[in-house]
Amino acid sequence: LVGLSGSERRRIHELSGGQQQRVALARALAPEPEVLLLDEPLSNLDQALRETLKVELKMILRQLKVRAIYVTHDQSEAVTMGQRVAVMRQGRLEQIATPDRLREAPKNVWLAQFLGHPNIFSEQSLSNATGIQVQGPAILRTDLISLGGNVAAEVLSYENQGSLIQIELLIPSWGLSVQWEGFAREVPSNIYPGKSVSLHIPDDAWVELGRK
């Protein structure tokens, strides 16, 4: 189950870091626990091995139908492993939700910053923006922004990140610059700094935040 067949007689110092973690997992699963606590189980492994083991670990837990509480400081691990994710701040629970819900609707400004939202706007910055219905503070979801619409914008910067394109846009009617990310195949090749474009930004792209 944990991929250690044929290693029964090997000593601990003869095992790799990944194999040692598999031994620890097998020992934890042997008593058939109802709930398994995993505290930073992959933190001492290199990146490539972490990526492999977190997928394997999730499959094993799902196969055995074992509930697990998985503690980690790695956001990508939390999103990969968790059906529900709880974010703690100085010992206090900030929010618990599915990974998608957490990303799409963080509870407050601190959580939005912690999750790395690129477009976080204060109440003051939104108060002078024309045509925006939210009061602020708020985030603007980049995944709901698309090219082609009735919001005029100017490209400030353009960064090719391989399969993704990162674009900074100035929206004159709002007096705000926003970050937008799109798949390279969906972004026209004639986008460049200084070019005027139009954006579609639906009302539900705005998510109001609590202040604390």
What are these model-derived regions, one by one?
Residues 129-212:
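Non-catalytic connector elements of ABC transporters
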Residues 45, 105, 114, 148, ...:
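Residues that scaffold the ATP/ADP-binding catalytic core of kinase and kinase-like folds
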Residues 1-107:
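ABC ATPase nucleotide-binding domains
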Residues 19-20, 118, 164:
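Gly/Ser/Thr-rich beta-alpha loop segments that engage phosphate groups in nucleotides
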Residues 104-128:
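C-terminal boundary and immediately downstream tail of ABC-type ATPase nucleotide-binding domains
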Residues 88, 112-115, 138-141:
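Short, conserved beta-strand edge motifs with alternating hydrophobic and charged residues
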